[in-house]
């Protein structure tokens, strides 16, 4: 069976680079420094118009934990409807209860709103209290895919749990490793986990084209370089694709 490479892209340019590099699917996010938040309507609409590969979008109203207020949940529901109206192929979301369990009721509501779109439960799973039960809850909520590092700092470190989760799922859901996936470890991860879909960022730093640069004034958190950003590299995606094809 062909192996699938999904790239987490933080901009339209990154989406295009992912496609050029040979990815079969893109997850479009904003604010990757916070783990990804919901992208803008404009970014979603333009990505849908420019991509020939599958396009998913993260539905996450803010950084931080995955326990959402009623207002935040309502915003997530509206964002799911926007993605459906734009013709996206899927949405990526994750909700937990205060006790660290999957919020089955709310996840099921969003999955129902998604309609024909695929629903991936993201790495909120990696903060869940009990992974085997969390997997059953994700399946019961109507998700078709789980993105996980195996509750470890990286997917290669969590490969043993990922393999167990894949076996437990038994084809009811696709387990997709993500976090720390690189050309040098993706083949080993495929062998250790038995998974066939993989999630990576393949990012590199891009310097700002600004010639005039005012020092001492920041627009965000202290220590953040205002004149550099991370973008998906088509060459890194291509290296991942080639390594995965040989796995």
UniProtKB/Swiss-Prot annotation:
<dbReference type="GO" id="GO:0005507">
    <property type="term" value="F:copper ion binding"/>
</dbReference>
<dbReference type="Pfam" id="PF03932">
    <property type="entry name" value="CutC"/>
</dbReference>
<keyword id="KW-0963">Cytoplasm</keyword>
<protein>
    <recommendedName>
        <fullName>PF03932 family protein CutC</fullName>
    </recommendedName>
</protein>
<dbReference type="GO" id="GO:0005737">
    <property type="term" value="C:cytoplasm"/>
</dbReference>
<dbReference type="InterPro" id="IPR036822">
    <property type="entry name" value="CutC-like_dom_sf"/>
</dbReference>
<comment type="similarity">
    <text>Belongs to the CutC family.</text>
</comment>
<dbReference type="InterPro" id="IPR005627">
    <property type="entry name" value="CutC-like"/>
</dbReference>
């Amino acid at each position: 069976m062909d192996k699938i490479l999904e790239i987490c892209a933080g901009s339209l340019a990154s989406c295009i680079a992912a496609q050029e590099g040979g990815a079969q699917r893109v997850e479009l996010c904003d604010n990757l420094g916070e783990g990804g938040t919901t992208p803008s309507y404009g970014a979603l609409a333009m990505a849908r118009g420019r991509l020939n590969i599958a396009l998913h979008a993260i539905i996450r109203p803010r950084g931080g934990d995955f326990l959402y207020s009623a207002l935040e949940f309502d915003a997530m529901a509206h964002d799911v409807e926007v993605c459906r109206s734009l013709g996206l192929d899927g949405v990526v979301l994750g909700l937990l209860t205060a006790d660290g369990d999957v919020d089955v009721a709310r996840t099921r509501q969003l999955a129902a709103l998604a309609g024909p779109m695929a629903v991936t439960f993201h790495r909120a799973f990696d903060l869940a209290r009990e992974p085997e039960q969390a997997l059953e809850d994700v399946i019961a909520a109507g998700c078709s895919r789980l993105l996980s590092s195996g509750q470890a700092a990286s997917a290669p470190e969590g490969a043993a749990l990922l393999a167990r989760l894949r076996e437990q799922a038994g084809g009811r859901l696709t387990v997709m490793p993500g976090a720390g996936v690189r050309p040098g470890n993706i083949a080993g991860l495929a062998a250790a986990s038995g998974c066939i879909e993989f999630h990576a960022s393949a990012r590199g730093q891009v310097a700002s084209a600004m010639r005039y640069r005012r020092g001492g004034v920041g627009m965000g958190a202290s220590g953040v370089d205002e004149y550099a950003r991370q973008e998906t590299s088509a060459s890194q995606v291509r290296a991942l694709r080639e390594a995965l094809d040989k796995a």
